[in-house]
UniProtKB/Swiss-Prot annotation:
Segments of this protein annotated with the region Disordered: 1179-1231
Superkingdom of the organism of origin: Viruses
Record keywords: Coiled coil, Repeat
Biased composition (Low complexity): 1219-1231
Coiled-coil parts of chain: 185-212, 246-274, 607-640
Protein's name in the database: Uncharacterized protein ORF23
Length: 1272
């Protein structure tokens, strides 16, 4: 167990040797994968940017997005993410040295990879079967090599001795791929092949010719296979196939041995090692390339080998790629038709779901979840199209209306569908997998648009519908918060226990375990690297625990009583790291809790803080009643604090229920339109004047959100520090200063009226523009303009439920008006929301409302259900135009921002994150339906940092920001793009920041003084990152691109065709850029900085279906055993991947012809664990390992999946496979590509879709007849 005195010496002793088969690491995952001690992948993080610190701050990309560091004295204990043991190595990092401390008897033989953390989450997210990192910084490579040299017993490192570079780095590809790639020209005719092979042997094949061949090959492929299905017949289908090529060490050695160019390649490698790029290029016969461009270029990136002179090669690709661009446009219609067909199936599924037949309901749920992944907006649009199509006859219309009215669960949140499925299958549904039925994507591959409504993130508690299960109710009662400034109570307990305390006092109730299962699914966070004897928890979750000194509880008894209280009451325990950070001694619990003025039952807190409007009305109307309640609340707070501090429970605790009921009754009794902001101001001043506040108390952070809605535009986490975003926001600044300062508090105490008048006058003086709003009897529009207010606890569910059931057609126009009002400020910049239940549905409803030609045919039941759901996430309080206002900050802003983004703005500046220097050094994020948009703010921050003002976004001029926003809006209007227009960002850079950017070296993947990588996070939920790179003028393009990790390999199947391809092309406006070459929307950058993967083929960026199939090259080199993932083996030769699915005989011949190697036992880092297969693969040598096929976890039944034959067979594309071959290959280990896996996943999805169609056909006809009978 950890304790404060833990040192390196006593940590790694003989009796603490870690045997992975005996730790909780093994227990957690033994049901998924049979572990072999020799091949455990030990993961550890080190943030290269932070060498200068004593102890490395390690960023963990966890689901809760909580960044924590487990520090042991001066060392950082380097823990991995979900499945790492974290016990592999401890590093001591000082400015000049990295000391490795490793177990005396290391239990690992294979270190397959090490990862650098890159900012607020790591580049590596461990989301897939073979997560890896790209090492493209020579300093990092050298560092890793030096580390490897210290590790005893490492048999197969990823770096060869002598400083060879990571097999995936571009500099090596300069040498290898020019020649090796010619093996992958399978779509040329035989004469061309023979000629090319001959020329390659002679060594006189130029780069440009190689590119031409690749392009021609792609075109030929496209032509030959244009009828094989939407996703396969696209150019990037072919390119994805090329991606599957895997350069295992054995294959490379074999190719080198076979190649007459081996000597030349070695020489080239020497030149590259010696930074002699020109010589290396001369060896390649491209002498002309190596002159001016290289000299210019390496002035800027002198320390980086990755470019290797390939920029000229890129330019060739740019020009050639237009052929594929033209081809791609032709598939748009086909994609659209398939999409509409899917939606039709989906609508029918929804309509069918009203049936009481459990089996059909179960099938519908499973079919839906496994087949349909559109965002709410696309769903709405397509559904509207379908409705319009179905509006041909009144009979059709009546049928639709009847079906719709009959189903009560239409358009309910994904969470509710999952709950229904849960009850049917008696198992916990994985929080993150949207298609558990597919073995390929058992975990983490796909997050449906609204799949995290019951996961508390960053202190936000989502509300639940009344119909939901008792399990959720108990989760509500537990009400555990987690976030940067609050710590999940469970984590507190774990942390406490983890430091050596007895845990016998802790009764793990069934309810508690169920709650943990519910919010965390199977894969969350268990205490890493410890022998933690708490099996019920170990088998469920993994916590990254806070540093031991940061948990301020006084004693075991306190913890026990707190836990008891928590089980019986709705206590929220805030946890503020600042307290622990400034004091080493343990904090007195009452002082700790008293520092949170709002600390109380959530409902009490809600009534006091967030329902001020209601209370103020009641103060006016029922003063006496309110005073009684206040007294009770006060008494209740005293009781709670006493119970918490003394470790005792008094009889008075029983009063809690009564108080809460009365408060709820009061809160429900009505709302006042007459309440003005000044009454609210008076109340708040009064409230805070009666508090005794510690000197370090930051009132801004302690205000309830309603208060902040009036007083602050945004808050800061540093006491006393006021940051103002725009000059026009002087109002907020003064309010912040006055309310924050002790002077203001004193003034309030001495003369409250005077203080209020002073503030009021100031506001009115400085806000003439908004004077009308101030003087109106309703300040809600103004408050909305200031901030979307968040509800932190579920207590509001009851109060707000159902309040918006009557929303009429004015709702959405009013929403638009509100958004337009916000355009006057940077309000939209404040949003960085988290997804919640129903957001996708609401967006869908928006689109249906907008697009259905005959409004009366809109699904009325659907609309009502959606509005009810909206009510559950909003606090009712009148707005001039419609009855919605003080909304859950993170939930509603997702809704509003989503609509807002899609209508008005490409990229929203985020003010909030800029205040934390660590975050500001990284990337602001806007989460929208599981997508995060890189903001203009990021660019501004980096430019500012380069100018020397330390990235302080608050110092930006309003002009700069306005330009960015106006530019984006202009572009959006011009092109009418209805999705997040990533292309806007390219244009923006070209037009507005060209010169500035050319002066900046945006160093990729590392946080250095040279700059910070931008990134787009496609999955805000799990911090899966996709780097975005900006290049200087020497590449003549602003080359920014998003890359999928394996975790998003299929995610974007949900938004195939969100942007019509023609619109994507429209963004490519020749008048908008002065560069030599026009921006090509098809070009895609990679982690290594250029548009190349293993095969040097550029990838298209923002095209329908692309993301669904592609993963970056960083995942094609190293293998990590990941729980829950089972792989399929595609052919190892990339150009064959698709052909593999359509002509296996030829494939087998080709495999034989090219002698594609299958790894031997030494190539463990390149192996997958295989279960099931789609096609024959080469037989392995007898010496190959035969891993045991993983079985589903024993703790819960796995989801029903289609029979194997159904998965394996799609009649149009796949041949039947002999059972013997199936059995043989199921236990086979082979090299495999992530990309081909995506094809397989796609095929499986198509199979499941077909099954669903069949099921619907068997279910729906009787329904239809029944409907017709009813009509008659």
């Amino acid at each position: 167990m950890f304790n404060k005195d833990l040192t390196i010496d006593n940590l790694f002793t003989e009796d603490v040797i870690i045997d992975p088969t005996k730790t909780q690491f093994s227990k957690t995952f033994q049901n998924d994968i049979e572990l072999d001690t020799k091949e455990i992948r030990w993961i550890f993080y080190a943030d290269m940017e932070m060498h200068g610190r004593k102890g490395v701050d390690i960023a963990f990309p966890t689901r809760f997005e909580v960044m924590k560091t487990l520090k042991i004295n001066k060392y950082s204990f380097l823990t991995g993410n979900d499945f790492s043991s974290g016990m592999g190595i401890i590093m001591e990092i000082s400015r000049n040295t990295i000391t490795l401390h490793i177990p005396k008897e290391p239990c690992f033989k294979n270190i397959t990879f090490l990862t650098m953390g890159y900012g607020s989450g790591s580049q590596m997210t461990l989301a897939g079967p073979k997560p890896k990192l790209e090492f493209n910084n020579p300093a990092v490579v050298a560092w890793i090599n030096s580390i490897l040299s210290y590790l005893p017993g490492v048999e197969n490192s990823i770096f060869e001795k002598g400083g060879d570079y990571f097999p995936n780095s571009n500099d090596e590809r300069v040498a290898y791929t020019i020649w090796d790639r010619m093996d992958r020209i399978e779509f040329l005719d035989e004469i061309e092949k023979a000629e090319l092979k001959k020329r390659r042997k002679e060594g006189n094949l130029t780069i440009e010719e190689a590119v031409n061949i690749e392009i021609k090959s792609a075109v030929n492929f496209y032509t030959n296979f244009s009828n094989q299905g939407v996703l396969q017949n696209t150019p990037y289908g072919y390119l994805t196939a090329l991606l599957s090529f895997k350069n295992s060490a054995e294959e490379k050695e074999k190719k080198l041995r076979l190649s007459k160019k081996k000597e030349q390649l070695e020489k080239i490698q020497e030149y590259l090692d010696a930074n002699q790029f020109e010589n290396a290029l001369k060896m390649l016969g491209e002498e002309s390339i190596a002159k001016d461009s290289l000299k210019r270029y390496y002035k800027i990136v002198t320390d980086d080998l990755v470019y290797g002179g390939l920029n000229d090669y890129i330019n060739v690709v740019f020009e050639k790629y237009e052929e594929l661009e033209k081809i791609q446009a032709d598939t748009h219609t086909q994609i659209k038709n398939e999409l509409e067909e899917s939606v039709y199936i989906f609508i029918n599924t929804l309509q069918m779901r009203g049936s009481d037949n459990l089996a059909s309901k179960k099938n519908a749920l499973e079919s839906y979840d496994s087949q349909f992944y559109l965002t709410g907006e696309m769903l709405g649009k397509t559904a509207a199209n379908m409705i319009n199509k179905q509006n041909k006859t009144s009979a059709d219309r009546k049928i639709i209306e009847k079906k719709t009215a009959r189903t009560s669960v239409t358009f309910n949140s994904i969470m509710e569908r999952r709950q229904a499925m849960d009850r049917i299958n008696q198992k916990i549904i994985d929080r993150e997998g949207a298609i558990r039925q597919s073995m390929l994507v058992k975990e983490r591959l796909l997050i449906a648009a609204s799949d995290i409504d019951d996961i508390p993130i960053d202190g936000i508690h989502y509300v639940y519908n009344q119909e939901e299960s008792e399990l959720l109710a108990s989760a509500q009662r537990l009400n555990l918060t987690v976030g940067e400034e609050s710590l999940n109570l469970v984590e507190v307990l774990v942390s406490r226990l983890n430091r050596g305390m007895p845990n016998k006092f802790l009764e793990i109730t069934e309810e508690f375990i169920e709650y943990l299962k519910l919010i965390m699914g199977e894969l969350s966070f268990v205490v890493t690297g410890t022998h933690f004897d708490w099996p019920e928890i170990n088998n469920l979750i993994t916590f990254n625990v806070m540093a031991s000194d940061e948990v301020p509880w006084r004693s075991i008894d306190e913890m026990k009583d707190m836990l008891e209280l928590t089980k019986s009451l709705d206590i929220v325990f805030p946890f503020d790291k600042r307290f622990a950070a400034t004091k080493n001694e343990e904090l007195n619990i009452s002082e700790f809790l008293n520092s949170y003025p709002g600390f109380s039952l959530p409902s009490v807190k809600a009534a006091l803080g967030k329902d001020l409007e209601k209370l103020i009305k009641l103060v006016n109307d029922h003063d006496q009643e309110i005073q009684k309640i206040y007294k009770e609340v006060e008494k209740l707070n005293t009781v709670i604090l006493k119970a918490v501090t003394d470790g005792t429970r008094t009889e008075n605790i029983n009063d809690v229920g009564g108080v809460v009921k009365r408060l709820d009754a009061v809160a429900k009794s009505g709302f006042s339109k007459e309440v003005t902001g000044w009454k609210l101001l008076e109340y708040i001043c009064d409230y805070y004047s009666n508090l005794s506040l510690p000197p370090s108390f930051n009132i801004l952070r302690r205000m309830t959100d309603t208060e902040r809605g009036l007083f602050t535009y945004f808050t800061t986490r540093y006491a006393g520090k006021i940051e103002i975003f725009e000059e026009e926001d002087r109002v907020y600044e003064v309010l912040l200063e006055k309310i924050h300062s002790q002077t203001m508090l004193d003034l309030v105490k001495d003369n409250k009226e005077k203080a209020i008048k002073k503030i009021k006058d100031f506001i009115l003086h400085h806000c003439k523009e908004y004077k009308g709003e101030f003087e109106s009897t309703n300040t809600t529009a103004y408050m909305n303009r200031l901030e979307i207010i968040k509800i932190e606890d579920p207590g509001f569910a009851e109060i707000s439920r159902g309040m918006m059931a009557g929303v009429d057609d004015k709702f959405f126009p009013a929403l638009d008006e509100l958004l337009k009002k916000w355009r006057r400020t940077d309000m939209e910049g404040y949003v960085h929301g988290v997804l919640n239940q129903g957001i996708g549905d609401i967006l869908a409803l928006t689109e249906i409302k907008k697009n259905v030609k005959e409004p009366e045919v809109v699904f009325e039941t659907t609309a009502i259900n959606l509005i009810k759901k909206l009510a559950a996430i909003t606090k009712p309080y009148d707005v001039d135009a419609f009855k919605i206002n003080e909304v859950d900050y993170d939930i509603m802003d997702s809704l509003l921002t989503g609509i807002f983004l899609n209508k008005y703005l490409a990229f929203i500046p985020i003010a909030e994150l800029s205040k934390d220097r660590y975050l500001a050094a990284n990337v602001s994020e806007v989460k929208l339906n599981n997508y995060t948009v890189v903001t203009f703010e990021d660019l501004l921050a980096q430019s500012a940092r380069r100018r020397g003002d330390d990235g302080d976004v608050a110092m930006m001029t309003s002009d700069t920001k306005k330009q960015a926003i106006d530019f984006a809006i202009e572009k959006l209007k011009k092109h009418d793009i209805n999705t997040i227009p990533i292309m806007m960002f390219y244009e923006f850079i070209n037009d507005r920041f060209k010169k500035r950017l050319s002066d900046v070296n945006f160093n990729r993947n590392t946080l250095t003084d040279e700059g910070t990588p931008l990134r787009i996070i496609m999955d805000g939920n799990t911090f899966r990152q996709m780097p975005v790179y900006i290049y200087d003028d020497l590449l003549r393009k602003k080359n920014i691109g998003a890359q999928n990790t394996i975790g998003q390999a299929l995610t974007l199947t949900r938004i195939v065709n969100l942007v019509p391809y023609e619109e994507t092309l429209m963004v490519n406006d020749p008048t908008e850029t002065s560069t030599d070459l026009e921006w090509d929307p098809l070009i895609q950058s990679t982690p290594s900085g250029l548009s190349f993967y293993d095969d040097d083929i550029p990838r298209p960026t923002n095209l329908p279906g692309l993301e669904a199939l592609r993963t970056p090259s960083i995942f094609s080199e190293i293998n990590v055993i990941t729980p829950g993932f089972i792989q399929q083996p595609p052919p190892t030769d990339p150009a064959l991947a698709l052909q593999f699915l359509t002509n296996r005989t030829e494939v087998q011949n080709l495999l034989n012809e090219y002698e594609v190697s299958t790894p031997g036992p030494t190539d463990t880092q390149d192996m997958f664990v295989i279960s099931d297969t789609l096609a024959p693969i080469p037989e392995l040598p007898e010496t190959s390992q035969q891993p045991v096929v993983p079985t589903p976890p024993a703790t819960r039944p796995s989801s029903p999946i289609p029979p194997e034959s159904d998965i394996l067979t799609e009649e149009e594309q796949l041949e039947e496979q002999p059972p013997r071959q199936q059995q043989a290959t199921r236990k086979t280990t082979t090299t495999v590509s992530i990309e081909a896996e995506d094809f397989i996943a796609y095929l499986r999805l198509k199979t499941l879709e077909q099954q669903m169609v069949d099921e619907l056909k068997s279910i729906l006809p009787p329904d239809t007849e029944e409907e017709e009978e009813e009509e008659e």
